Amino acid sequence: MAYGSKHPYGEIETETTIKNISSDMCRQFYKDYFIPNNSYLIIVGDVNPTVEKQRAAKYFGAWKSGTKLTHTPPAVDMNSKTTLDFVNKSGAVQSVISLTYPVNLKPNDSDKLKARVMNTMFGGFFRSRLNDNLREKHGYTYGVRSSLSDDRFVGRFSAGGSVRNEVTDSSIIEMFKEINRMKTELITDEEYHSVRNVMAGDFGRSLESPQTVANFALNIARFDLPTDYYNNYVQNLMAVSKQDILNMANKYLKPENAHIVVVGNKDIASKLAAFSHDKKVHFYDVYGKPIEMNTETPSLSASQVIDKYVQAIGGIDKVKSVTSVATNMEASLQGMVISMTEKKKIGGKYLQTVSLMGNTLQKQVCDGTKASSSVQGQPQTLTEADIQELKNNSDFCPQLYYSSKGHKLEVKGIEDIEGKKAYQLDITPKVGQKWTEYYDLASGLIIREVKVDGEGENMATMTSDLSDYKEVKGLLVPHKTVISGTMPMPLEAIVKSVKINEEIPDSEFKID
């Protein structure tokens, strides 16, 4: 959004773009750019310069120079008016806000340090104005930050954080208020002393790392900084005035050029249109490509969606005949095999174990009345909602009993899920968190489930994509589940076996 799709910084890494890179291209890149006249050797420590130069000549002396290639990317087109860009994340209970735009700030610009002080005061540390407003004063978020980055081609300003759905619009309003304050008011004496002292302290602590010292030397060489730039850093920092900070705010805080990017539940999108210059919400997919949201009106009610699903997986008689199910699945995580076993039995009995290379990571069990959970052998506290969820999981087809258990059901609309149109069904239980299921319009099968995992600052949205339905004793069962949102990368779980109506002794569900 900030740089545009034609600028290298605006490129998004996808499976397709990665596949476009061949081994020959990597070899050519290495040949073109890994040359001594395009390299720096930096040594930090208690060393003898003469000895280290001799050692460098010994090991790198035969390295042949090459033609140093230079590329200048196209200029970034500054957004001329504020726009509201929205990326739908189904089922999300929080919105991620990023107010962002490119800035012309080079590493060797004379006002770089002044600009950094301004940004730190605005949103660069815990006691910043932005955090004080949205976290401390209003309680909208657990933390909000801003950053102002320099770059030899084009820098970037960004401000935002995660906020509750219902205060997304209010959070954006408060962000604009704080920007206006920075541009129209001198900071207070207390703020002035605090921000400079914090930055001076951070700088001093950073010198404890040899990597930081090496990076300072590299910056001086690469960006033609004064040789005493870092020696005089604290002195120059303390010389930044209140007026300097006000001037920098007016130079670099440009909300009129901003993309307000919001990732969250589309149910809140219409409330945000007022922030866009054209009073429209511009929708994008996760790769930053413009899309049109589906506006079709659902033709089925919630009960009809579930009836169609039950019929699709085998019919109500087949579904009700199920008394037990045992499923074994496997997934791979960084070359290690994760085994997942799930057993269900009528009477609210449920067992799930997750093992990594033979060692049990997690175990959940419900005997129909009581329930327990452990992670790596350590007992976990279960809420009433957790226990009820485990009981619900014991059903082969829990959808059949949603209404009888008092769940509130609502078809919210039609979504495009991985190229398929699907009904969005929101389920609100009597106890616990709401979740969402997506049913393929064509087949009637569930193709996605979205649930909220965790609480407070640790809350995350877990998405499970279901596919590869196969028949087992006359019933369709998904044999592939891709789980995303609760870990750095998606986890693909494949069903290895499904046993329906085979004896599972009650002792399997015994709670220790």
Predicted features along the sequence, with ranges:
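N-terminal mature ectodomain segment of secretory-pathway/periplasmic proteins
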Residues: 304-378, 406-416
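C-terminal soluble interaction/assembly domains
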Residues: 239, 243-251, 256, 262-265, ...
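Buried hydrophobic packing residues in well-ordered domains
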Residues: 26-29, 41-43, 56, 99, ...
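Gly/Pro-enriched, hydrophobic low-complexity segments
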Residues: 49, 355-357, 421-511
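Flexible, processing/modification-adjacent segments and terminal tails
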Residues: 297-311, 365-433, 441-443, 452-461, ...
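An aromatic/glycine/proline-enriched structural segment found at the starts
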Residues: 40-105, 264, 273-294
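M16 family metallopeptidases and their MPP-like homologs
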Residues: 1-16, 38-44, 94-106, 110, ...
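Solvent-exposed coil/turn segments that connect beta secondary-structure elements
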Residues: 44-48, 89-92, 102-106, 123-126, ...
